[in-house]
């Protein structure tokens, strides 16, 4: 995330915290992130040099006024005006990260070869909470390439204990060992 985009997310979250609107701002930015992802034409229009600032602001008002918190809409307009709107997905991720830090939430992406049972999910969640002292929020993914085991990703850290990793290590060992 660029320094400018980080500055925007820090400022918006700080303001939202002052007025007690953290949950609303988080919810709105997450919904907008989905909208921008699902409608790439919107980003194309907002980054176009052929469309005036005023027209972009009018478009944002028409699409989002009354549907998102006024601070979020103002930030969108500012990012458009400053030519930083391409950083909007990173901005939204920054808001989510600040919220998680503020509320003591550990966001963990869990990748397994097949879906975990409810019991496995609950055990993993409870164990992560015991270790971290934070509330664990799990995002579950399946990747058959794992073969077995789990890969956990959180706060820029990746912990992999998958059968695929073990097989890869064994392969390297065999290749580097001379007979």
Where would I find each of the regions flagged by the language model?
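Elongated, mostly alpha-helical coiled-coil "stalk/stator" tethers of large membrane protein machines
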Residues: 1-179
């Amino acid at each position: 995330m660029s320094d400018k985009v980080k500055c925007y997310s820090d400022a918006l979250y700080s303001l939202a915290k002052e007025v007690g609107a953290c949950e609303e701002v988080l919810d709105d930015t997450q919904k907008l992130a989905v909208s921008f992802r699902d409608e790439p034409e919107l980003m194309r229009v907002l980054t176009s040099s052929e469309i005036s600032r005023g027209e972009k602001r009018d478009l944002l008002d028409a699409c989002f006024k009354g549907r998102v918190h006024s601070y979020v809409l103002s930030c969108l307009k500012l990012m458009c005006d400053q030519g930083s709107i391409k950083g909007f997905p990173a901005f939204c991720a920054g808001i989510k990260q600040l919220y998680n830090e503020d509320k003591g939430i550990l966001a963990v992406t869990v990748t397994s070869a097949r879906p975990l049972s409810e019991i496995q999910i609950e055990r993993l969640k409870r164990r992560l909470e015991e270790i971290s002292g934070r509330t664990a929020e799990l995002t579950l993914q399946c990747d058959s390439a794992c073969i077995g085991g789990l890969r956990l990703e959180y706060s820029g850290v990746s912990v992999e204990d998958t059968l695929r990793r073990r097989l890869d290590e064994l392969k390297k060992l065999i290749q580097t060992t001379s007979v």
